[in-house]
Amino acid sequence: MEKDGLPTYAAAANQPASQPRRRFRKSRSLKVIAVACLVYLAYAQWHQRSIAPYRTTTLSLERLQADLATCAKLQHKPQDPAGQRARNGRYIEGHKPTLIKNATVWVGEPAAGTSAEDAHAGKGYSWVQSDVFLEHGLIKSVGANIATDSLPSDVQVYDAQGRPLTAGIVDMHSHAGVNPLPQLRGNEDTNEMSADITPYVRSIDGLDPLDHQIQVIKSGGVTTSLVLPGSGNNIGGEAFVIKHAVGRPDGRLEVSAADMLADPDRSWRYIKMACGENPKRVYGKAGEHGPTSRMGESWEFRHAFEQAAALVREQDDWCAAAQAGGVDAVETYLPQDLRWETLGAVLRGQVHVNAHCYTVPDLEAFVDHTNEFKFPIRAFHHAHETYIVPEILKRAWGGRPPAAALFATNMDYKSEAYRGSERAGAILHDAGITPVYVSDNPVLNAQHVVYEAAKARGHGLPYHAALAGVTSAPAELLGLGERIGKVKPGYDGDVVVWDSDPLSVGAAPAQVWIDGTAQYGEPFLLNKTWSVPSVDPSVDALLTAPSEEVTLDSASANIVFTNITTTLHPSFPPAALSPGSSAPNVLIITAGAITCLGPCLPHLPHVLHTHTTIPLGRFGGTFTPALTALGSALGLSEIAAEPSTRDGVNTPTSPFARAVDGLLATGSKQLAAARRHGVARAVAAPLGARGVGVGFWVAGEGEGEEGGEVWGEEVSVHYALGRGAKEPSLSAAVGELRGRLLEAVEGLNGTGKETETVVGRYDEQAFLRRVVGEGLALVVHVDSADTIKALLRVKGEVEDALADVGDALAGVDGDEGKANGTRRIRLVLVGAAESHLLARDLAAAGVGVVLAPLLQYSQHWDQRRSLTGAPLTNGTAIDALLDAGVDVAIGASPSETWEAGWLSGGWVE
């Protein structure tokens, strides 16, 4: 068979019938290619989206860029602002420079080359004779004999006349401005009570620059304060550091909280937290949200930090993505939550934490929180038990133990303060913990916060550490240690010239400068003599060593006190002492009676063999009468905030009580403290100041015996006519007292003695009849000058009624109340903040005054006209009262002996 019949491949390809098939195949290939391209594009887009998330067009590029800039702020690590500057950021153009000549300067740091160990011990510190030049809001130079011809022609010269000059006082716990004085409901902004955790509130938003207390505080040399929210909740909010210069009179251009900021750049932020009793008391109520125990408080803290930590993580993740790939790399805005912003800054190390914590459990729990969430704490405030557990403080996160911001002697007012010690500062200093001293204004008047440091020194804290505790130490804790707290070139021009050693009792500023501007045009100045105090650590140790209490049976006590240097006893004037050193002065007590004061040379050979000798050391001692405490709850209350430790409070509707029936004197820490401070006797009124006062001995007669022995069961009749008496009104309370006194006058019989039944022996009228008929003291607790004026009218009306009794009172026992043949009731005012306004009237009426406390301030409305003393006022209430001839005493306080010292410290001539 031939192969010609078979088709060939070439022939088949050339046949015309095959052309349409060829066109079809080419079209399909193009489609395949197109599909492949589409697949590739889809894949590329998918792949691109897997690399960088797709950003929707709804996000604002401008806002994303702002968020990216915020990342830098979040990651910023603050540093203490440097001191060396051309001018202070708070300086106001046009203020003249000032040269302070002839000052005795406390620089605030040891001499160059002093080792850290020696500096801690107090070596290298000294007062130096120097001039200080202030310009552009700064300390420009410190040195001897600065020549005025080297200074600007418009320089102002202030002659310090050798007086001491220190840096301005720094109080790192104050509520000035947010708790203005006098306290009123409408201006109280210390605590935000809407929740237990309020880190988002700010003290500056409630700060009133017109709070007069800001000026009063400055008059004590305080130039800078940390204004904190209160301690009513566990996290109270953000705090701010202010200077005490407000408006044009103080050299400022405006009246505003912003203008008061100590560091306008706000290098650091601050926050207040609190542990313990306060949050439990405020929020610990059944059925309501809030902690009822310290366990609950720890949960509140940890839960809050957990929320803040979550926000920080989200922000860090967002910032990492945006910083790596730009704003196109993020799909959302930066996570932000104003509620947790401040706590987030705490966890980032941008906020100095200050925590109100008293007790060992509180301190230990809070230290645990710092380690769990990795944030530092700057200081524990109040901190009454820190001296017991310094090792716990040293476990706080960050490697730097927190400081302890303390009161010197204000303690025992509630359970968590009951273990406090007057030597806490000295103990903490020895343990390597920094003690600083604060006011908690208005709890204590910050005008006298330097006085807290003085008391700490008296209880063993070395001189340099005590003065640092209100200057350089708080400045450093605030992160402003190169700006304030020392007298060095480059520091802010915040300095104080004092009328005496600032750590002496009664010291007051002669002038205060803030940012180089003098704050007083014509300050009142107390003329005092002073000598440069020794700051040698060995001498300081002798001066502040704790004294041993000596208790001997008064009936058989045979004692010789050697080296008496001063006497303030009215029966033993200074003339009894020998001024020479060849014959040291001694005080001889034989069988419990004083037998000699002075050199006593004829007595010494005998008594040195028969008496116990008690040397008073190298610096000697002062002989005073024992003190009598009046005006406190001593003997009736152990812990003010714990009802179970108190006798209880009497109200206007309570039965008339006798304090002797509620005396709580056995095993009292309060009585022991009073005894250590020289108090021998006390007069206590029923709590609420309505009833009959009792007189008792603070110490027992024999060694180791408890106090509380009564020397007078019924020594006075007490009423209160202050804020608590306005039920229903103060006028009604005054009228009721008038009526009862007049009723008592009518109850006298012809002999002037009270008519009573056995049952009525202890009722109110019986005691008031003794007031009007026998001279029993009527003690009224009152502050307002208006109420005092009303009392003077009542006194006159009652005495007129007594005059009507006429001869019926002739020969009555107890003639102490008679004057010029007219019976007078013995009226004594306690508190008496505004008594100086009626000094002459009080003297004419024969009214005695017990100032309690001695140094009053306008804490309440009826104290608003108190005199604060130099440099603001020419004296205090006691000056006006003594000048008018009023009999004046000082009321009991936690530091009664220190307050008595103000009288000999130059505040009263």
Which ranges hold each PLM region?
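Short, low-complexity, Lys/Arg-enriched N-terminal segments of secretory-pathway carbohydrate enzymes
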Residues: M1-R25
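His/Asp/Glu-enriched, well-ordered alpha-helical/loop segment
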Residues: R21-R25, A42-H76, A86-G89, G94, ...
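Polyanionic/metal-chelating signatures
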Residues: K26-A36, W46-H47, Q213, K218-I377, ...
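Histidine-rich, glycine-flanked metal-binding segment
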Residues: W46, I51, T70-L74, D80-R85, ...
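Divalent metal-coordination and catalytic microenvironments
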Residues: A103, V132, G137, G162, ...
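C-terminal cap of metal-dependent C-N hydrolases
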Residues: H120-A121, K488-P533, V560, L568, ...
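Hydrophobic faces of well-ordered beta-strands that scaffold small-molecule active sites
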Residues: V170-M172, S225, I271, V353-A355, ...
